[in-house]
Amino acid sequence: MDSKCQSIRSKTQPNLRCLFNAKNGNKYCPLHLIQNNIIDFNPKNEEFFSTVTDNNNEHLQNTINPIYKQISLDTINSIGIKTFVTKDLNKKDNGKDKTTGIKKKIKNSKSVSSKMLHEQKVTTIADSYQNTEDDLEMKLLILINNEENLEKISKLIGPAFNDLTLAEDNEDPVTYDQFWTVENGIKKPSGINRYFIFSYIDSNDKIRCFTIMSINDLISHNNLEHPITMEKIPEEDILRAIELIDFYKKEIGLFNSSNMEISREFQIKHKLSNLFKKFHVHSIYLEENWLLDITNLSNLDKIIHETNKLISNNLVSINPNLKTFDLFKKKFTVNSSKNKKILETDSNTTKETYIDAQWYIVEQWEKLIELADNTNNQIPIWVLILGLSYVVPEIKQKFPDLEIML
């Protein structure tokens, strides 16, 4: 039986099949299972788009700058659609200007798009991220068509720019995006865009890599240590990363507010998905939306508070060598007078959103799992689940014996 998810990759890529494995006993992966309208992948779609591309290859080769041959099929198709619409604006039908109808559709489309971004739910995160990524890649391709820019970017990205397999770790230590895989004993680069990474050489002469989003997040939070080695990233490399970030901000708007909000949500889901996959070896299957659907800071605060108590009550079972712990200590509240999300810290108060609260919880969960004295110890997992169940009643229905397990 085919273990791959049987859905299309996304609505913007109907010609491609989802790359994730189907959830145990289901046709679809966890990402698509939480969507309302799942569209099955049809191999004929792939054949159709391949035929269209083949028929246009000769024309494209003669008219397009070679740098654009790196653009994906979806991007090429979108260029074709935009070109058609632009030409059509100058035409009239029976004396009537067609622009009115087209402008109206564009206006309506923008209105719907803005509403979706404003009311964005977990089920649209992946598609929104894909659209943003496509737009950024287009701007990037235009940028690197200039040799001076290309040379500058390659130096700022660092030693792994020309070969991602040189990276010591096969994945980003924050988002778990893969840099390379091993096939038949040979390292092969993954599909990640090499222009959106950052690399440096540590004190042991090993090349360390981050996605551009991860290194930006670490710098913005003044967390300048590598998450795995706990070694401080050299100052000259931090300055180089900042220069790369500032260059992308200015030239392609990589870190503007809308892009960062979408990528942040996607990173949370990605981290959460990878964390929950680790529990599959114990036949424990959790749903990402149990956390991601919670946007009320009081509920997120309750998860933190209850999990802290559960860890305290079960610390010996988690790891008999531990005497104390420093997890789930922050408190999230809502400033009702200004209707703002507030994160309370010991020394000051800074404005944050529920996204930051979710990010904090996922990071704390990761550290909780690491506290276990051995990999077979399931107590930390059940502490995680029970803490979440205080806000998500559905969990207790799925695990009716949950409370007696601890």
Swiss-Prot record:
Please report the name of this protein according to its UniProt entry: Uncharacterized protein L504
What is the species of this protein?
Acanthamoeba polyphaga mimivirus
| Top-level taxon in the UniProt lineage | Viruses
